Amino acid sequence: MSETATTNKETRGFQSEVKQLLHLMIHSLYSNKEIFLRELISNASDAVDKLRFQALSHPDLYQGDAELGVKLSFDKDKNTLTISDNGIGMTRDEVIENLGTIAKSGTAEFFSKLSQEQSKNSQLIGQFGVGFYSAFIVADAVTVRTRAAGSAPADAVQWYSKGEGEYTVETINKESRGTDIILHLREEGKEFLSEWRLRDVISKYSDHIGIPVYIQTSVMDEEGKATEETKWEQINKAQALWTRAKSEVTDEEYKEFYKHVSHDFADPLVWSHNKVEGKNDYTSLLYIPAKAPWDLFNREHKHGLKLYVQRVFIMDDAAQFMPSYLRFVRGLIDSNDLPLNVSREILQDNKITQSLRQACTKRVLTMLERMASNDADNYQKFWKEFGLVMKEGPAEDFANREKIASLLRFASTHIDSAEQTISLASYVERMKEGQDKIYYLTADSYTAAKNSPHLEQFKSKGIEVILMFDRIDEWLMNYLPEFEGKAFQSITKAGLDLSQFEDEAEKEKHKETEEQFKSVVERLKGYLGSRVKEVRTTFKLANTPAVVVTDDYEMGTQMAKLLAAAGQPVPEVKYILEVNPEHALVKRMADEADEQTFGRWAEVLLGQAMLAERGSMEDPSQFLGAVNQLLAPSH
């Protein structure tokens, strides 16, 4: 290749406040300096795509050079890195317009000229113009030599700038079609004068561009030593895995690709690969990992999908495409028509983004539904790793609340195990005749839940109760009022009514007992006063003298504990004391004529009930004093 300056050299100022913009971009716009290579290879890919598209109707543009690609070479002596392509190239006017203006791209102009159908087929990126200027992150000067397809060698153009507000442009001779970008590297950019560093960056950012990317490497002799002779070696695969038909990709390839995008050593549990054409054209490849990352609940945890636009890598951790409760999902989305902000690091919050988010969310939920139905063992592995995160779903995603609810798993009295294997659908299938509610209990632990006195009548009547003991559970139930038309009912709430499971004789007996016990209830109210909201009789207990419950719309015990643990203000919870009139201890108290001794029994009843419900009491000394006096009364 030979380039010689000829005529018509001029110095021009940039058409905007480029000096300030370059300074801002270099120090703020891009998060890491190696992105410059992604931008320049992306631009080269655009140029090749433009030529390929134009050559469909004008094949003579190839001029005998139809092997399209991008080539990278470096010169340690000159301290330069060169990115070359044999794409569409630029004329002098195009150079001035496209390289002399910030936020202007030849791609956007080219794209606007296409008909709707053509634009579907032309894979173009770069709807803005700052990508080229990212070269100044690592270079203190940039030379561009370019020759437009179909033009003569003598009509080539050279552009040169130090990024300080002005540039020079002149006409040169250039034998080959396309563009060479020569970066004169600053000190902190010299790390890119390395074949292995370039290989690493190309593999990271450009492995799945549909055109080959080559680097110039030394030819080795028989002893494995580098000679002065060089050759071009293709570095990228030049075919994106997700663009291939699903039938052409093996399970092993899917697993290896997962490890590539996630940096995980384990195989994924399951994946979903889909290409969608229509209002939005995109491909998604979504994976469910086998293990949760250690920082899944860390607020700083980065999550989201890899974003590609027309097979060019744009960013990691694009959280806009997945709700927070699905933050464990790995994979990518490749959009053909997604608009981006000028930095490509920040997605525009627009209708396309929202549409893709909804589609990806439904895809993941469907994938999980299939796993739950067809592979219960794997779904149980998934639940152990990500169940707590899934429980955030009903609060965050109202539109998919029923789907999320069907994926939740709990322990229950149906199985004597702390394993959360019970689905809400299976619970509903086992509901007793006449049962119209889904009964549940929240507690600090599985042991506390399964031994709760609130369960006594449910056990005697054979009614299944869901046992919840994760810290998030009571918060979750605020956002999950029903499932399949069946309302949820906490069995620790005052509104609990099991009368539909009693026969008439039982109801009549309870009514008589309640009437007889009224005076005892009044005595208890008089002694306990404002320490409880109310005192009432209950027939849901068998082996326990009393329990405390809260009103249906009052904060529950577990929610109060959750707020307290988070350092949040906790409103005072006023409990209702429910007393079992058929328990021997309560009968003994009812027969007690001495008010002081009666008061001690009242202390014991309330203290036991509070201890069972909360695991603590406000004044243990008062409770212990009453117990001691009852055990060893003074003579």
From Swiss-Prot:
GO CC terms in record: cytosol
Chief subcellular location: cytoplasm
InterPro entries given in the database record: HATPase_C_sf, Heat_shock_protein_90_CS, HSP90_C, Hsp90_fam, Hsp90_N, Ribosomal_Su5_D2-typ_SF
CDD domains: HATPase_Hsp90-like
TM segment ranges: none
SMART domains cross-referenced by the UniProt entry: HATPase_c
Biological process according to GO: DNA damage response; protein folding; response to heat
GO molecular function per UniProt: ATP binding; ATP hydrolysis activity; ATP-dependent protein folding chaperone; unfolded protein binding
Subcellular location(s) per record: Cytoplasm
Region annotation B: where it falls in the sequence: 345-561
Similarity remark: Belongs to the heat shock protein 90 family.
Protein name as annotated: Chaperone protein HtpG
